[in-house]
Amino acid sequence: MMLLTELGAATSIFLIAHIIISTLISKTTGRHLPPGPRGWPVIGALPLLGAMPHVSLAKMAKKYGAIMYLKVGTCGMAVASTPDAAKAFLKTLDINFSNRPPNAGATHLAYNAQDMVFAHYGPRWKLLRKLSNLHMLGGKALENWANVRANELGHMLKSMSDMSREGQRVVVAEMLTFAMANMIGQVMLSKRVFVDKGVEVNEFKDMVVELMTIAGYFNIGDFIPCLAWMDLQGIEKRMKRLHKKFDALLTKMFDEHKATTYERKGKPDFLDVVMENGDNSEGERLSTTNIKALLLNLFTAGTDTSSSAIEWALAEMMKNPAILKKAQAEMDQVIGRNRRLLESDIPNLPYLRAICKETFRKHPSTPLNLPRISNEPCIVDGYYIPKNTRLSVNIWAIGRDPQVWENPLEFNPERFLSGRNSKIDPRGNDFELIPFGAGRRICAGTRMGIVMVEYILGTLVHSFDWKLPSEVIELNMEEAFGLALQKAVPLEAMVTPRLQLDVYVP
């Protein structure tokens, strides 16, 4: 609604600028573009996106098909809404769509795209990706900090047990942010970044949520560059203010870490390794800005996307108690009630893994994936896609497509336990389920995300019974759109320990 109001107020400005701008728009006369809505002069389809663009685009796809083309402001945008369409763009034409389009988020939040998420596909991006995979996110590196995850979960279980004894409710997002930020902090900086839950961790969570929210907005200035200076929605002002907060926090972490280098002699952490190996054979060397931008990526994406998936999964199980009970029964049979769940137990818990896949399907953390842009014109399924066309893959729509999934609005983990669906893997090769994207620009933290969701969710379900606070009549399952898909109303719950009491002592 706010976007429509702002667009309406600016219509006269757009129309005056139309004649000038239209001469700058590249023509595709005679080319067979994909179908799509016509939109308005200059502003194009921007008003059609509404407050929930992933939902609006899914509705449009029912009319226009698997591949759509929209004029959004002065920019062309292709939207893929089926597994085959996603595969065509992200696998067959992966290299042509390996870059990110310029946008205010990259400029004002990500240190002018000096990070890993928004960086140009080239030597610096490859170096950032290589270091992250080798020393934190990849298979062997991930195994090396399994004890950190286990220890931090021990602290979380103790805290939740204490809250249960005192009759306090658990705010799930706050609890998860505290634990996951401390996990990542220990790997990257050799320290827990938060000692106690309270104002500091809540401020950090609010900052992360705001970043993910405003970075996901369809910013008018990104699509009509000549109007960017006006900042009609106030988005860039918010981004700059938020960046100052994050930069102050990251600079403090960076400086404190440098001052204690001698204490880690012989036991380097992730930041030590990045600073020591921040160059490559192509002459690329990471600056302090690059390193801070990388820390920003890992802290924000590492805490928000996984915590969001876990929160959605718990909410679905509380709404469907039979699923919760079945998951607990599986764990009781495999693990018992006299010890905690271990990461090594997870391969023996197919129902838990099915719950995680079903959550990735119905509530993907990034509903529209991160946008890409075409380096050259290309043909997709017979349609012409011009150079510099932005690409959005509607992961949310794919997960709710009745042509792909039976009863897609139903939360049903059973669908992943038998038949072809039991072989579907969320790591980017099965395009029916691509919560982390696919291709070269797939989320660098895919492995870590899956491990964190399965392990933390499994531990929470095994360790506690869950119910809503007494005054909550019905669980709110509405979404809040952003770069990551949050619950509109954060989940709060009353928990009761279900294992023997010494398990909750870290």
Curated annotation (Swiss-Prot):
Classification via PROSITE patterns: CYTOCHROME_P450 (PS00086)
Gene3D superfamilies noted in UniProt: Cytochrome P450
Keyword Lipid biosynthesis: no
Keyword annotations of the record: Endoplasmic reticulum, Heme, Iron, Metal-binding, Microsome, Monooxygenase, NADP, Oxidoreductase
UniProt record, GO biological process: anthocyanin-containing compound biosynthetic process
CDD domains with a match to the protein in the record: CYP75
Reactions catalysed: a 3',5'-unsubstituted flavanone + 2 reduced [NADPH--hemoprotein reductase] + 2 O2 = a 3',5'-dihydroxyflavanone + 2 oxidized [NADPH--hemoprotein reductase] + 2 H2O + 2 H(+)
EC number of this enzyme: 1.14.14.81
Molecular-function GO terms, alphabetical: flavonoid 3',5'-hydroxylase activity; heme binding; iron ion binding
Tissue specificity note: Flowers.
Positions contributing to heme binding: C443
Main location: other
Cofactors: heme
Principal EC category: oxidoreductase
Protein's pathway: Pigment biosynthesis; anthocyanin biosynthesis
Task of the protein: Catalyzes the 3'5'-hydroxylation of naringenin and eriodictyol to form 5,7,3,'4',5'-pentahydroxyflavanone and 3',5'-hydroxylation of dihydrokaempferol and dihydroquercetin to form dihydromyricetin.
Family: Belongs to the cytochrome P450 family.
Protein name: Flavonoid 3',5'-hydroxylase 1
